[in-house]
Design a protein with these regions (language model features):
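Compositionally biased, intrinsically disordered/low-complexity regions enriched for serine, proline
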Residues: 11, 58, 82-84
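Proline-rich intrinsically disordered, low-complexity coils
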Residues: 4, 14, 61, 85-87
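Radical SAM enzyme core and accessory elements
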Residues: 49-54, 63-168
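Short secondary-structure boundary/capping segments
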Residues: 24, 52-59
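Conserved C-terminal portion of the radical SAM core fold
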Residues: 1-50, 100-115
Length: 168
């Protein structure tokens, strides 16, 4: 089909490691035709199974309510609450990976050392983001098929593109 769509990635699940996040970036890189990518931090809402897992493993106090000095807009999108032992993600990892995930997902792995450096180097981050935005963003929303044919999603050969059809 030629319907525009976006991919959504959540970072910071209980027991998640940096390598798991990079596996998600690899999966997004292999995806074809998306015209948007949304990355968010995991939020542990009351009554959810993932909050229960975080509490049972003592990553999150049972009475936790989302709040903190760093939150903006109610803290729902930029405040990560759990504390896990290494090798699992740490708060600083989550913030850096949310910031740079689109770069990991867009660029080939041969450039991931640069992306890793950009997690803490703002000048390099801006340079890579400028390149990403120039190549990926378009003035209009495109459908998946158009985006693939114009090669403005992660780099793919048109011959490897799946043909989609709507069955009624």
């Amino acid at each position: 089909s030629n319907i525009p769509y976006s991919l959504n990635v959540i970072i910071g699940m209980p027991f998640e490691t940096r390598e798991m996040v990079l596996d998600s970036a690899r999966m997004v890189h292999q995806s074809k035709g998306y015209d948007g990518l949304t990355i968010g931090m995991m939020q542990f809402y009351h009554g959810t199974e993932l909050r229960k897992i975080a509490v049972e493993n003592e990553f999150l106090p049972d009475d936790y309510v989302n709040s903190g000095e760093t939150e903006q807009g109610g803290g729902y999108l930029d405040h990560w609450a759990i504390e896990m032992p290494k090798p699992y993600l740490q708060e600083s990892d989550v913030h850096r990976l949310v910031k740079t995930f689109a770069l990991y997902a867009y660029f080939d792995e041969s450039r991931w050392d640069e992306v890793y450096q950009s997690e803490t180097d703002e000048t390099l981050y801006k340079k890579l983001m400028d390149e990403y935005q120039r190549e990926f963003f378009s003035d209009i929303q495109q459908g998946g098929k158009d985006r693939i044919l114009n090669k403005t999603c992660a780099k793919h050969e048109v011959t490897s593109t799946y043909e989609w059809e709507v069955l009624t």
